[in-house]
UniProtKB/Swiss-Prot annotation:
Source species of the chain: Pseudomonas fluorescens (strain SBW25)
Residues that bind Mg(2+): 306, 308
Location within or outside the cell: Cytoplasm
Gene from which the chain derives: xylA
Isomerase recorded as keyword: yes
Keywords: Carbohydrate metabolism, Cytoplasm, Isomerase, Magnesium, Metal-binding, Xylose metabolism
Molecular function terms from GO: magnesium ion binding; xylose isomerase activity
Main localization (coarse): cytoplasm
Protein name, entry field: Xylose isomerase
UniProt-listed Enzyme Commission number(s): 5.3.1.5
Disulfide bond entries: none
Secretion signal span: none
Length: 438
């Protein structure tokens, strides 16, 4: 049976369209910088916010009455949920999706049941992928919702919890391989602490390092060719998360020799919580060589928690996409909508409205960012600003030809007296605005 009988396939109709559900800017096959929009953006809809979340929050029960969330046999409901999901993906015209293991299959009362249920659902998802052509951007394991993970998964003080998490990640990685997923994500949902009074930081970091090494070893053993991605987040649900931001993740990866094995999946709202701009987190990851993929959403600047709203700022997404294009674009990653409708958006059609508007935002951002890359005024200014480092003194310093003492002697001997030069921030902000708004 159709789950969205009142919704036709969403189509591109252009900026002048008054249709309630139509793309004004996302023209999937429009060529931008030599390839179609869809290949640049690699957009995905997530399973958890779209098909699992019931509209509950800490102050109230779920407000949604989704047909796939009614009471009944867990496996029958899981199959119905998958059918609804692929109907949604197909009508939306999105190319990818993402999931946690327990989003798609009931956990059951034992690992044996978990494994059996998950295997059945992977078969079902595979059939849907073959029928629709929709692909898996990434899979992951939910090692944070069950009470056994209250003190973390890999960082848990109980090695049996560590082993249980390993069983889930093993299963989810194998499923991602089977479904030809492009990436596998490791979000440390509760890998952190509530209080230092009962926490051994060194031990927990070593446990995380050991777990990540095991994941990397398994990736190579099974022949998974996609990227492994850690998703940084500074806090929530714990007081302090170990994967605080991109720079922190890089430090952790470098400590355990994994900086060439694991990249980052950057979420806009998590950057906000870390006190950074989304632009900063992407630029940092690119500069460190660990940029992988994006969770596209936004936070509310008045709220200190993860609101996971749909992205709606062309300006913010233009700067993000500019950095990604400058870095060569997505390799295996993409823009995954880790976004949810508001609790009062009760109708099933609201799921379409949220995604369609966000997809249009990304399409506009891509066009603006492409224009910035083609006439790269920002890079031209940076090249000029740092030009001194291409001169003999700068090159000699970078090549290690000076010690601190010999460089000081050079400064004394040449009576150096450099003067400050304008950074032209306001001019550059005007340049960016002209690309975005004209």
């Amino acid at each position: 049976m159709p789950y969205f009988p009142g919704v036709e396939k969403v189509r591109f109709e252009g900026p002048s369209s008054d249709a309630p559900l139509a793309f004004r800017h996302y023209d999937a096959n429009k060529i931008i910088l030599g390839k179609p929009m869809r290949e640049h953006l690699r957009m995905a809809a997530c399973y958890w916010h779209t098909f699992v979340w019931p509209g509950a929050d800490m102050f109230g029960v779920g407000t949604f009455k989704r047909p796939w969330q009614r009471s009944g046999d867990p496996m029958e409901l899981a199959i119905g949920k998958a059918d609804a999901a692929f109907e949604f993906f197909s009508k939306l015209g999105i190319d990818y999706y993402s999931f946690h293991d327990t989003d798609v299959a009931p956990e059951g009362s034992s690992l044996k049941e978990y494994r059996h249920h998950f295997a059945q659902m992977v078969d079902h998802l595979e059939r849907h992928q073959e029928q629709t052509g929709i692909k898996l951007l990434w899979g992951t394991a939910n090692c944070f919702s069950n009470p056994r993970f209250a003190a973390g998964a890999a960082s848990n003080p109980d090695p049996e919890v560590f082993a249980y998490a390993a069983a889930q990640v093993f299963s989810a990685m194998n499923a991602t391989l089977r479904l030809k997923g492009a990436n596998y994500v490791l979000w440390g949902g509760r890998e952190g602490y509530e209080t230092l009074l009962n926490t051994d930081l060194k031990r927990e970091r070593e446990q995380l390092g050991r777990f990540m090494r095991m994941v990397v070893e398994h990736k190579h053993k099974i022949g998974f060719k996609g990227d492994l991605l850690i998703e940084p987040k500074p806090q929530e649900p714990t007081k302090h998360q170990y994967d605080y931001d991109s720079a922190t993740v890089f430090g952790f990866l470098h400590e355990y020799g994994l900086e060439h094995e694991i990249k980052v999946n950057i979420e806009a709202n998590h950057a906000t919580l870390a006190g950074h701009s989304f632009h900063h987190e992407i630029a940092t990851a690119v500069s460190l060589g660990i940029f992988g993929s994006i969770d596209a959403n936004r936070g509310d600047p008045q709220n200190g928690w993860d609101t996971d709203q749909f992205p709606n700022s062309v300006e913010e997404m233009t700067l993000a996409t500019y950095e990604i294009l400058k870095a060569g674009g997505f390799k295996n990653g993409g823009y995954n909508f880790d976004s949810k409708v508001r609790r009062q958006s009760l109708d099933d059609v609201d799921l379409f409205h949220g995604h369609v508007a966000a997809m249009d935002v990304l399409a506009l951002a891509l066009e603006r960012a492409a224009a910035m890359v083609q006439n790269d005024r920002l890079q031209q200014f940076k090249d000029q600003r740092y030009a001194g480092w291409q001169q003999p003194l700068g090159q000699a310093v970078l090549a290690g030809e000076f010690s601190l003492a010999s460089l000081a002697e050079h400064a004394f001997a040449h009576e150096l007296n450099p003067q400050a030069v304008s950074g032209r921030q306001e001019m550059l902000e005007g340049v960016v605005n002209r690309f975005i708004y004209t």
